[in-house]
A protein has these predicted regions:
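Extended beta-strand solenoid/passenger and fiber regions
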Residues: 107-188, 193-197, 212-219
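Hydrophobic beta-strand signal
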Residues: 101-102, 191
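A general secondary-structure signal for short beta-strands and their flanking turns/coil
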Residues: 56, 79-83, 187
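Loop/turn positions that initiate beta-strands
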Residues: 95-100, 187
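Short alpha-helix capping/helix-loop boundary micro-motifs
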Residues: 81-93, 176-177
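A general sequence property marking short-to-moderate contiguous segments
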Residues: 68-70, 99, 107-109
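Amphipathic, membrane-inserting segments
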Residues: 73-76, 87-88, 103-104, 110-118
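N-terminal disorder-to-order initiation segments that are Gly/Lys/Arg-biased
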Residues: 1-78, 201-243
Length: 243
């Protein structure tokens, strides 16, 4: 049975999810240390070993098969695996390591991290603000809860607009908290529960060679290029595979 590529592309345009596709490029840092590992001090990749260049575009994809299995005692603790399969047009062929962000989807993320030296700090994912309808009306939500460390134990709660703000790139800006003396000091830990858009990294080599032969309404067979499918994993869970 031949695949009707025109029908697939038409359905993809009407029912596929909007995905921001960012091409990932290996960073050349780390050579000065004599190691293949990326340099933590690299101003381009920040130690991840990857940079995202100007090759960014919005595409449509069918996203299926979200798995979230918790494997206890694996790697000395719980390890969550969140993977999806994305199918897209043949001319859209992501490579291993590329970032795929669902533009119209959101999820909640709980994170504990350390305050950086500068006033602006990026979390695992960019903080996103959404409108939520309640019994009393529509409210905006982005950071749902945050708490700082104090002398090694849980300290006071942190409030948006009082202790920090969120910039246009979805990063935390500690400037007002630093001025008031309520923000975590550099090196101190804090926990934050926030809303973000799911960002995935491609962890399989795509089916760029998935082609077939057809002979529909033709005396001779011809080559048919079929849709591309890739396996992706939530970015913070995929970094172990991408190092």
């Amino acid at each position: 049975v031949d695949l009707d590529l025109r029908l697939f592309n038409r359905l993809l345009g009407t029912h596929g999810q909007r995905v921001l596709w960012e091409v990932a490029i290996r960073c050349p840092c780390g050579g000065a240390t004599g190691s293949q590992a990326a340099a933590i001090s690299c101003p381009i990749c920040g130690g991840t070993g990857w940079e995202f260049g100007p090759l960014i575009q919005e595409v449509r994809a069918v996203v299926v098969g979200f798995h979230r299995d918790v494997l206890y005692y694996d790697r000395m603790g719980p390890f969550e695996v969140g993977t999806v399969l994305m199918s897209m047009r043949p001319e859209h062929a992501p490579a291993y390591g590329d970032r795929m962000t669902l533009i119209d989807a959101t999820m909640r993320m709980s994170e504990t991290t350390t305050r950086t030296a500068g006033p602006v700090q990026r979390l695992r994912y960019a903080i996103t603000e959404i409108d939520v309808t309640t019994a009393t009306g529509t409210i905006k939500q982005s950071v749902l809860f945050a708490r700082r460390e104090a002398n090694g134990v849980a300290g006071p709660e942190l409030k948006r607009g009082t202790d920090f703000t969120i910039d246009a790139s979805g990063r935390i800006d500690w400037s007002i908290g630093d001025a008031a003396g309520t923000a975590p000091r550099p090196g101190e830990r804090f926990s934050i529960y926030y809303i973000c858009r799911p960002a995935f990294r491609v962890i399989s080599y795509p089916h760029t060679v998935r082609q077939t032969r057809g002979q529909k309404k033709s005396p001779e067979d011809y080559q048919v290029i079929t849709p591309v499918q890739v396996m992706c994993r939530l970015e913070h869970l995929a970094m172990e595979l991408l190092t």
